[in-house]
């Protein structure tokens, strides 16, 4: 066989193999992943991984890759992981020919920080399976490409594989990312697992493979907003009050779910969060994201109820199964005001959901030795979990699905009574998604979403200055209660000690707020007040994700099953010159259940960046508001009408004429029955 690669490539892995790294004790490791490969598939997976390796080392590395595939279900290329701790260093410590190339390296390494990543050695940032890329060969090669990237080139990355550098121009994206995009017939978990094991598909979740994760802070503000608005809408709490004296119960203290306790505390509630993995509880307790920890149901309940009675906030981490907790609370007649779940139910059979009666360690062992038996136990626990929620609902508890596919997992396990129509999931479920009931109408329909930024200097003073600038802007543009909530959030953000990893901030803002803050920050960079900044957002946004069980669950015109909004948003951000953009399959809710995209935008203080911001920031938000308006969402229609007036002669969004329901029903009865 003729190998043309060596002479034809100048950007490649080093010829000499790195020394096999040491694995530090005390860090979580991913369980064995499911794949069900044939012998031919296994050979293909090894052959695929060897594409990154010089032929002189194929015999040695083929054996290592085969061992990894057997033990872990995936080829991670552990030998190629850099020795020691990875973290997002100050931007000046990175090599690169353009600022974007260096900035993106900061964000990649931040995703793999031991203090942030769920399974750092397996490149999993959060969400049980959300990876930066598939393996450490890809990581090293991406870094090499970013070091060579110029401001007239674009790096293309497909499911973690750096396809190459291609000539573009200064106003084009520097990196274009896609993760796990599959042809429809094969777009399911089984086929994805095979593709991932073969080394051709990466599950990027949202900001894991999109290189924009900022630690659990990234979801705290959204969870805070959700809890606060749930209290207003469902418990009758006035807009100027918080959740003092209320009890919130949920499950999960991982990369995203870890925000629950902190958000509940900031919102003033007493809370109990169940988590089976004690190491995750340890992480959140050390970081100050939960205030108490215990393996005793009695103690957890007493702490929470004592705080609730005094109207004081608390976040109690209960080390145990959520179903055990619910049984105990129910049998002891404890009233729960708000209830949810943030276990990784987008992959319930891959370790995302732990069956009742198993410890976390037993769960991991059973996944490896008896995956079929594990599946049976998961289904049994899901059924019981659902039964307990129904019992609490009868007592007046408000339960909402937090978009983790919990209700879909219950349905997939064989429970049809969870469906609104009693048969299938086309009309949704009897319990609402938090987007359907709360976040959609209260925030997304207005354009409010999870805007974020990272100070690339890693200097806390830069973050403080941007916090103050944001607070000043919002205070001067206080139009409705959402603005006041956001003002209080950013005003107190530093006090609430939210930073884990690089100096980043999450702040819900609407289209104009995002654009104006972005322009202000770029001006501050230009004036030398702060160092470079990178902007982004969660894919979980008004226009970033099409997901009928979550982000688009409050779209009621039938288009909730369409994936065109997220795709158009991604393409539009590319056309307008965002620094890097990403489009993924299955973020949050699982493969085949979502198409989601995001971006990163580097602020270097230039007028070029100002131009891009003025074009891209309104688009990135308003594409979602426009779609929601066309679905006849009232708040979105109001927002679009205001936008059309504001941008008259520049932008114009189509709005719906409203038809009378009675007329449509009458015509159907008269002419179509």
What are these regions (language model features)?
Residues 278, 320-323, 342-347, 403-409, ...:
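Glycine-rich beta-alpha junction loops
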Residues 315-343, 350:
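Active-site/ligand-binding-proximal alpha/beta "capping" segment
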Residues 1-216, 371-520, 524-536, 542-546, ...:
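Long, compositionally biased, glycine/small-hydrophobic-enriched stretches that function as flexible linkers
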Residues 270, 335, 398:
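Residue-level detector of anion-binding/catalytic polar loops
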Residues 538-568:
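Small-residue-enriched alpha-helical segments and adjacent helix-cap loops
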Residues 265-267, 330-334, 415-419, 525, ...:
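Short, solvent-exposed amphipathic alpha-helical segments in soluble enzyme
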Residues 205-228, 232, 239, 244-247, ...:
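Catalytic or ion-translocation cores adjacent to nucleophile or general acid/base/metal-coordination motifs
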Residues 323-326, 385-386, 517-521, 565-568:
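Glycine-rich, charged/polar anion/phosphate-binding loops
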């Amino acid at each position: 066989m003729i190998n043309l690669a060596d002479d034809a490539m100048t950007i490649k892995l080093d010829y000499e193999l790195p020394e096999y790294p040491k694995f530090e004790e005390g860090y979580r490791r991913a369980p064995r992943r499911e794949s069900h490969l044939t012998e031919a598939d296994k050979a293909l997976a090894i052959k695929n991984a060897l594409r990154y390796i010089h032929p002189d080392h194929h015999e040695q590395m083929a054996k290592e890759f085969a061992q990894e595939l057997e033990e872990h279900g995936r080829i991670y290329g552990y030998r190629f992981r850099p020795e020691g701790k990875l973290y997002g260093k100050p931007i000046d410590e990175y090599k690169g020919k353009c600022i974007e190339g260096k900035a993106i390296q900061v964000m990649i390494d931040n995703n793999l920080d031991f203090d942030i990543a769920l399974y750092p050695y397996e490149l999993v940032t959060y969400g049980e399976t959300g990876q930066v890329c598939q393996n450490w060969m890809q990581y090293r090669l991406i870094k090499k490409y970013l070091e060579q990237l110029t401001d007239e080139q674009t790096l293309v990355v497909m499911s973690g594989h750096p396809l190459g550098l291609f000539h573009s121009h200064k106003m084009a994206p520097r990196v274009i990312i896609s993760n796990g995009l599959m042809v429809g017939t094969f777009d399911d978990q089984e086929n994805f697992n095979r593709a991932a094991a073969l080394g051709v598909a990466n599950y990027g979740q949202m900001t894991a493979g999109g290189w924009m994760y900022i630690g659990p802070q990234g979801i705290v503000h959204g969870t805070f907003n959700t809890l606060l608005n749930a209290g207003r809408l469902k418990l009758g709490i006035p807009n100027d009050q918080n959740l003092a004296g209320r009890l919130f119960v949920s499950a999960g203290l991982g990369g995203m779910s870890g925000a629950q306790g902190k958000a509940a505390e900031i919102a003033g509630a007493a809370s109990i969060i169940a988590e089976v993995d004690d190491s995750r509880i340890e992480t959140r307790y050390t970081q100050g994201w939960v205030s108490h920890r215990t393996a005793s149901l009695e103690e957890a309940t007493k702490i929470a109820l004592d705080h609730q009675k005094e109207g004081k906030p608390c976040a109690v981490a209960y080390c145990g199964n959520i179903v055990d907790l619910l049984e105990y609370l129910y049998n002891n007649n404890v009233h729960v005001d708000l209830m949810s779940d943030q276990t990784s139910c987008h992959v319930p059979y891959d370790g995302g959901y732990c069956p009742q009666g198993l410890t976390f360690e037993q769960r991991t062992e059973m996944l490896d030795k008896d995956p079929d038996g594990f599946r049976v136990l998961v289904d049994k626990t899901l059924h019981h979990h659902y039964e307990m929620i129904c019992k609490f609902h009868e007592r007046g508890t408000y339960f909402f699905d937090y978009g983790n596919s919990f209700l879909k997992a219950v349905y997939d396990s064989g429970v049809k009574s969870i469906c609104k129509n009693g048969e299938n999931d086309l009309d949704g479920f009897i319990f609402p998604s938090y987007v359907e009931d709360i976040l959609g109408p209260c925030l997304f329909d207005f354009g409010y979403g999870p805007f974020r930024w990272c100070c690339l200097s890693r200097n806390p003073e830069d973050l403080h200055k941007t916090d103050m600038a944001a607070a000043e802007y919002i205070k001067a543009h206080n139009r409705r209660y959402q603005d006041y909530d956001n003002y209080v959030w950013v005003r107190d953000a530093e006090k609430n000690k939210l930073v884990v990893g690089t100096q980043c901030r999450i702040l819900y803002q609407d289209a104009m707020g995002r654009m104006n803050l972005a322009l202000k920050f770029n001006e501050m960079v230009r004036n030398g007040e702060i160092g470079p900044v990178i902007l982004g957002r969660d894919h979980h946004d008004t226009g970033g994700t099409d997901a009928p069980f979550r982000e688009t669950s409050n779209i009621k015109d039938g288009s909730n099953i369409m994936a065109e909004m997220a795709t158009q948003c991604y393409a539009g951000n590319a056309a307008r010159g965002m620094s890097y953009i990403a489009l993924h399959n299955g973020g949050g809710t699982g493969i085949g259940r979502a198409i989601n995209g995001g971006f990163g935008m580097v602020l270097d203080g230039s007028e070029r960046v100002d131009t891009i911001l003025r074009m891209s920031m309104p688009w990135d938000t308003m594409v979602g508001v426009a779609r929601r308006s066309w679905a006849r969402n009232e708040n979105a229609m109001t927002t679009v009408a205001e936008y059309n007036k504001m941008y008259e002669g520049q932008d114009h969004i189509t709005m719906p004429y409203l038809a009378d329901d009675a007329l449509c029903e009458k015509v159907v009865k008269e002419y179509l029955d």
